[in-house]
């Protein structure tokens, strides 16, 4: 019986099929399998021109064959002199040098014989043909001695060095025209799945675009490899086996995309075991658990999970170290920093949990805010400033706890970030884009945790700005009544962002004929709610009380989404019939909108931060007619009071 017809459930527990191997052990097991399978430890060397060597790794030490500079050279424009001839020169007692005692030189000129110093042109005064000097100069002032940069036979670069632009210039100055470097690794990316379609094609229900191959190939190129994507292979074990056999003949690493788990159509592990050696199937990391590591025909094979975040992190953990090893280079190490966690973080025991975070400096302290953690939420990697790894032995971290972050962006860029935590609104997304367009150094990083969560984060010093639209049912006011209750005596400013229309988001044409909140209890109406602590959730609960409706009577009340766009997406996909949200979200998905109320949405900021240079670009943006016009084009917004301080 072919191995791919053997059900995974029949595999013995001590087999490598879908286990929970710690990442470090998985790397060791894969390394042992590569060694036993005859995989090359390092790629062969080749000699390339300097012009083609950027990013390559040296295969031998680079020694200077000439000195640089190859002669004593003038380091400045001016006159070359004998330092001894300038002794005693001062403002009150200048020294005059006759034409035969100096030579005019430009930067880089060989030093004339008998001259050992250069006087800068701007320090030379002329009295007829004589040069008047008002200060003595020491020997070798502004003189570049032979070999100042590098001397003949000096080691310039070691073996295993990844070549940068400055390295190439130094090598050229030291006499090199070519360098011996390791051949660049060749990575083949093999996408699989009946549902996968090439980028640029129209997809129907149950079909997805092959974004993983694009991403993994680009990651390989960033790591110094030559990468190419192979045609998509359907979920057919015989065709997959043939594609794998053909691919390993012409690459140094084969990455098989998807099919790495233990589902009905997941064949990667069994094909690798049939064709070669299966070293590991299942690694104790999240996301990225169903990883396949093996060897086929002396070629390492990595089976990456189909979820994009899992695939990207799998490359970081397993593929990048292998590519560095093949080139004989050390692994690329990202900069690290310490940060305070903005909110509680729960993690499963037994797995290294890779959490994407946004970073910003608040009150002189680096703050990390976790991003959505789903393995399919690729935008969490797009927006991430860093990675927090919660080790397998921990169940998470408490708010305010100090953690170590692996940086994905520079500290300088992060230091300019405006951290906004609180209620979701599309205007903040628009502001983030506008700020970046005006000044690429400025980032507005929003985390959507609801109005209450934002005010708590502001109280705890974990953000610069909290977005809020909390309704106080007792007074009918928004946000202001909550400041004393949540922030205590903290001095804050409240800046009006917009007024916005809240209402029921329904399918086009309102097929159920809903008229308002009271219709949510009708049979067959499925509601999509916002999370606890969200201002929209508070508004819904207030409206339910006003209508005398119990939340238990609403089908879907317990189903929560984190943003207005997520609510609209659920309705658009037919997973719900109605949800309370803003008009702009309904318009974004081409849905109908039933108005319920118009409410203010405000930005709450600590008074100590309100006038800081960091926030100045945001306040300036809110006064911009261009930005206000862009907001109004979204629909359902009023900008008359935008930027006005209301407290």
Q: Locations of the language-model features?
A:
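Flexible glycine/proline-rich
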Residues: 24-27, 41-51, 55-60, 73-74, ...
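Short loop->beta-strand "edge-of-pocket" segments that line small-molecule binding or catalytic clefts
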Residues: 415-424, 518-542
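Ligand-binding cleft/hinge of the Venus flytrap
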Residues: 430-440, 517-518, 530, 536-559
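A conserved helix-loop-strand patch within extracytoplasmic ligand-binding domains
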Residues: 481-532, 622-628
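Periplasmic-binding protein-like
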Residues: 489-501, 591-620, 641-644
């Amino acid at each position: 019986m072919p191995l791919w017809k053997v059900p995974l459930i029949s595999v013995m527990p001590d087999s490598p099929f879908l286990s929970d191997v710690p990442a470090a052990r998985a790397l060791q097991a894969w390394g042992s399998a590569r060694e036993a399978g005859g995989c090359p430890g390092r790629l062969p060397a080749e000699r390339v021109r300097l012009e083609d060597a950027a990013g390559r790794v040296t295969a031998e030490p680079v020694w200077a064959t000439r000195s640089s500079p190859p002669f004593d050279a003038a380091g400045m424009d001016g006159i070359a002199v004998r330092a001894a001839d300038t002794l005693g020169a001062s403002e009150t007692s200048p020294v005059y040098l006759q034409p035969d005692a100096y030579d005019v030189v430009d930067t880089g000129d060989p030093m004339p014989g008998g001259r050992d110093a250069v006087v800068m042109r701007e320090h030379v005064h002329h009295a007829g043909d004589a040069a008047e000097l008002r200060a003595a100069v020491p020997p070798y002032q502004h003189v570049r001695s032979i070999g100042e940069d590098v001397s003949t036979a000096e080691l310039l670069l070691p073996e295993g060095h990844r070549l940068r632009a400055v390295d190439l210039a130094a090598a050229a100055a030291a006499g090199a025209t070519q360098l011996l470097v390791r051949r660049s690794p060749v990575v083949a990316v093999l996408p699989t799945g009946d549902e996968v379609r090439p980028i640029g094609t129209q997809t129907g229900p149950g079909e997805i675009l092959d974004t993983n191959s694009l991403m993994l190939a680009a990651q390989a190129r960033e790591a110094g490899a030559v990468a190419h994507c192979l045609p998509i292979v359907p979920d057919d074990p015989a065709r997959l086996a043939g594609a794998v056999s053909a691919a390993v003949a012409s690459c140094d690493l084969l990455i098989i995309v998807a099919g790495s788990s233990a589902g009905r159509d997941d064949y990667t592990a069994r094909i690798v075991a049939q064709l070669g050696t299966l070293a590991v199937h299942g690694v104790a990391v999240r996301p990225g658990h169903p990883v396949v590591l093996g060897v086929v025909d002396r070629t390492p094979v990595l089976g990456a999970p189909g979820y994009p975040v899992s695939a990207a992190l799998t490359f970081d953990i397993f593929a990048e170290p292998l590519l560095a090893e093949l080139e004989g280079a050390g692994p690329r190490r990202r900069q690290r920093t310490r940060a305070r966690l903005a909110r509680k973080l729960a993690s499963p025991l037994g797995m290294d949990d890779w959490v994407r975070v946004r970073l910003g400096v608040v009150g002189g302290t680096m703050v990390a805010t976790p991003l959505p953690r789903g393995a399919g939420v690729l935008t969490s990697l797009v927006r991430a400033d860093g990675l927090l790894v919660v080790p397998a032995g921990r169940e998470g971290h408490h708010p305010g706890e100090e953690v170590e972050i692996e940086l994905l962006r520079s500290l300088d860029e992060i230091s300019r970030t405006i951290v906004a935590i609180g209620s979701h609104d599309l205007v903040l997304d628009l502001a983030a884009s506008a700020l970046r367009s005006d000044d690429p150094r400025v980032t507005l990083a929003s985390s959507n945790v609801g109005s209450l969560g934002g005010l708590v984060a502001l109280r705890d010093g974990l953000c610069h700005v909290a977005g809020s639209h909390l309704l106080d049912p007792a007074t009918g006011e928004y946000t202001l009544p909550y400041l004393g209750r949540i922030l205590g005596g903290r001095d804050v400013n409240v800046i009006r962002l917009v007024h916005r229309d809240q209402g029921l988001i329904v399918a086009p044409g309102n097929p159920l004929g809903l008229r308002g909140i009271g219709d949510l209890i009708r049979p067959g109406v499925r509601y999509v709610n916002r999370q606890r602590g969200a201002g929209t959730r508070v508004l819904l609960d207030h409206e339910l009380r006003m209508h005398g409706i119990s939340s238990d009577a609403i089908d879907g009340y317990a189903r929560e989404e984190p943003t207005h766009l997520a609510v609209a997406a659920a309705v658009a996909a037919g997973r719900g019939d109605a949800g309370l949200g803003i008009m702009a979200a309904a318009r974004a998905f081409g849905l109908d909108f039933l108005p319920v109320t118009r409410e203010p949405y405000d930005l709450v900021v600590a008074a100590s931060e309100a006038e800081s240079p960091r926030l100045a670009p945001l306040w300036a943006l809110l006064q911009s007619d261009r930005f206000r016009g862009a907001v109004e084009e979204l629909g359902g917004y009023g900008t008359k009071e935008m930027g006005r301080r209301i407290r």
